[in-house]
A protein has these predicted regions:
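Solvent-exposed, well-ordered amphipathic alpha-helical segments
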Residues: 2, 12-15, 286, 290-292, ...
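Flexible, low-complexity junctional segments that flank or bridge functional domains
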Residues: 20-291, 295-299, 303-325, 417, ...
Length: 489
C-alpha cells in the first residue's frame, strides 16, 4: 500500500511538472507587441462600441487603461496577457464585450487544463459551498460543505480577484457568481496558477471550523487492461442528433398535476420555432393549466427565436425595444474586425440613419408583435431564471414579467433589464497575440422606464443553500411544485 501511494504521488508530481513546463513553454510576446495590441483594442472600441461609457466614465476607463499599459514591463504569454486585458474589458460593464483566447490557443487548451484546483465551488453572496471534490473518496470535504479559506486566505479574496475577469451587464453581479460557480478550478489556475497542495478551511460535520490539505486534481488515466470486463452499456433508442436536441430543449408533461415543464438552454439553435409550435399544441391538447419555463441555463441567442416564444405567452402586443442604435456603418479600423464587410452589409440592409446622426434598427423600435391566437397558453406560468439567464433569454422574462398569470422565480437575471449592447457581435482580433474581444454593434434600450444597471429581479426569490446542495434537490422547482399543488387543491 505504501509503495502504491508513493507511485501515485510520483505520477501526479510528474504530470504536474510536465503541465507547468508546458505552461511556461507557451509562446511569449514582447512588451512592445502586447502594448501595441492593447492600443489597437482601445482605438477599435472607442471608434465602434455603442456603449463604451454607459456605466464607466471615460476618465475612469482611460485611467485604468494607462495603469494596465504601465504594468506591462516584460514579455507575456497569452494567458498572462489575457489576465491583463480582461479586467479592463470587464470595466466597460457590458456582458457581450468579453476578452477571449485566440482560436489557436483554444484548440490547445485541453492539454493545459490539468492538474488543477480540486474543488468545484458554488458562490453566492459571502458563501462558498462544495459542488464536487476531485477526490471522490474524501469523506471530509463533500458536496454541500462550506469552505471559508484557501491557503489561509478567505474565499472572498479569490472570488473578488476572479470577478474582475468576468464581464457583466452593468451591476448585475449574479452573472459573475454563476459564471464563477461553473468554472472556478479553471479560473483559479488561469489567474493564480497551481500549488502542489492546498490548505482548505472548511466547516466540518460538527459545525466547527477545520482544515484539510488537498492536492491538485488530475483525472485517472483510462484503463487499458483489455482483460478486465467492461461495464454494461445502457442501450438508448435515441440518435446522437436527438440527444443533442434534448440538451437544448425538452418538454415533459405531468397529467396528474396538469403541469408542463419546458427546459430551454439557448435561443441559438435547435429548430426552436417548430419545437415551440409542437410543444404548445401538445400543452393545449393535454389541457395543461400550469407551465414551468426553465431559462436558468439560457445565455441567449437569436432574438427572432425569443420573439417566437414570447408570442405564445404574451397577452398583448409588444415591441422589442425603445431604441436600437449603432454609432456608424463605417467601421473604423475594420481590418481588425471579423467579417466587417458582412456586418456593413447587414447594417445597410436592416438599419437606417436617423435625424440624430445614428444608425437605428427601426424594425425593433417601432414594430409591435401580435400574440398568438392558436395554441397560445393562458394558464399559470412560472419563469425560472438565474445568473446565466442572459441577453435574449432575459428579454423574454422582461417582456412577460408583470403579466397577471406570470411569476418569475429564482434569482436575479444576468442580463440587464434596462438594456444591453448586442445584436451583431463580431470579434476584434488583435494583430500580434491574436487575442479576441467581442464587439457588440448596437445599443439596445429595452424599456427606458425600467431601472438601469441591474438584472431582472424575481417575483419569488429563492437563493441557493448549502442544505439544498448537500441533499441534492432543487429548491426553486420544489417551491414551484408547492405553488402548483396549492392551486390545484
Amino acid at each position: 500500500m505504501k509503495r502504491l501511494l508513493v507511485l501515485i504521488f510520483g505520477i501526479s508530481f510528474l504530470v504536474e511538472l510536465n503541465a507547468q513546463k508546458a505552461y511556461s513553454a507557451l509562446p511569449k510576446y514582447t512588451a512592445a507587441q502586447v502594448r501595441e495590441d492593447a492600443l489597437v483594442l482601445k482605438k477599435v472600441l472607442e471608434a465602434n462600441h455603442p456603449s463604451l461609457y454607459w456605466y464607466t466614465p471615460k476618465q475612469q476607463l482611460d485611467s485604468a487603461f494607462e495603469q494596465m499599459l504601465n504594468s506591462i514591463a516584460d514579455s507575456l504569454n497569452e494567458i498572462e496577457y489575457r489576465n491583463k486585458i480582461a479586467p479592463w474589458v470587464a470595466l466597460i460593464k457590458c456582458g457581450h464585450t468579453t476578452a477571449q483566447y485566440s482560436k489557436q490557443f483554444i484548440k490547445q487548451l485541453p492539454k493545459y487544463r490539468y492538474p488543477r484546483f480540486p474543488l468545484q465551488l458554488k458562490f453566492w453572496e459571502d458563501s462558498a459551498v462544495v459542488l464536487s471534490n476531485g477526490y471522490l473518496k474524501d469523506s471530509f470535504v463533500q458536496r454541500g460543505t462550506i469552505v471559508y479559506s484557501i491557503n489561509n486566505k478567505p474565499v472572498s479574496y479569490f472570488r473578488d480577484s476572479l470577478f474582475k475577469q468576468i464581464a457583466t451587464d452593468g451591476y448585475a453581479y449574479n452573472h459573475q457568481y454563476q459564471t464563477l460557480s461553473s468554472s472556478f478550478p479553471d479560473g483559479f489556475k488561469q489567474v493564480f496558477g497551481v500549488d502542489s497542495t492546498y490548505l482548505i478551511g472548511y466547516m466540518n460535520q460538527a459545525g466547527k471550523q477545520d482544515t484539510i490539505s488537498l492536492g491538485n486534481f488530475v483525472p485517472a488515466p483510462r484503463d487499458t487492461n483489455t482483460n478486465r470486463p467492461r461495464p454494461t452499456e445502457r442501450k438508448t433508442t435515441l440518435s446522437k442528433r436527438q440527444l443533442r436536441l434534448l440538451a437544448i430543449r425538452s418538454l415533459s408533461i405531468d397529467t396528474i398535476t396538469h403541469s408542463a415543464y419546458i427546459r430551454l438552454t439557448t435561443f441559438s439553435k435547435g429548430n426552436l420555432k417548430s419545437f415551440f409550435r409542437r410543444s404548445f399544441k401538445k400543452i393545449q391538447k393535454e389541457n395543461i393549466q400550469h407551465l414551468i419555463l426553465d431559462l436558468r441555463e439560457n445565455g441567449g441567442g437569436r432574438i427572432t427565436n425569443s420573439i417566437a416564444l414570447t408570442k405564445y405567452l404574451k397577452h398583448s402586443p409588444f415591441k422589442i425595444a425603445d431604441s436600437v442604435v449603432a454609432i456608424s456603418r463605417k467601421f473604423k479600423h475594420g481590418q481588425y474586425i471579423q467579417s466587417s464587410w458582412l456586418y456593413w452589409l447587414a447594417m445597410n440592409l436592416g438599419a437606417s440613419k436617423a435625424a440624430d446622426g445614428l444608425i437605428h434598427f427601426k424594425r425593433f423600435e417601432q414594430h409591435y408583435y401580435q400574440p398568438k391566437n392558436r395554441f397560445a397558453f393562458k394558464g399559470n406560468t412560472y419563469l425560472v431564471q438565474g445568473g446565466y439567464t442572459f441577453s435574449a433569454a432575459s428579454m423574454v422574462v422582461g417582456a412577460l414579467k408583470g403579466q397577471k398569470n406570470i411569476q418569475v422565480v429564482g434569482e436575479e437575471s444576468g442580463g440587464g433589464q434596462y438594456g444591453n449592447s448586442a445584436m451583431h457581435i463580431p470579434y476584434i482580433t488583435l494583430p500580434n497575440t491574436k487575442l479576441r474581444v467581442r464587439l457588440p454593434l448596437y445599443r439596445m434600450v429595452i424599456d427606458q422606464n425600467r431601472p438601469k444597471g441591474r438584472g431582472i429581479e424575481p417575483d419569488i426569490k429563492i437563493p441557493p443553500s448549502s442544505y439544498a446542495i448537500r441533499m441534492g434537490f432543487d429548491p426553486k422547482m420544489a417551491a414551484i411544485q408547492a405553488l402548483i399543488k396549492s392551486k390545484n387543491n
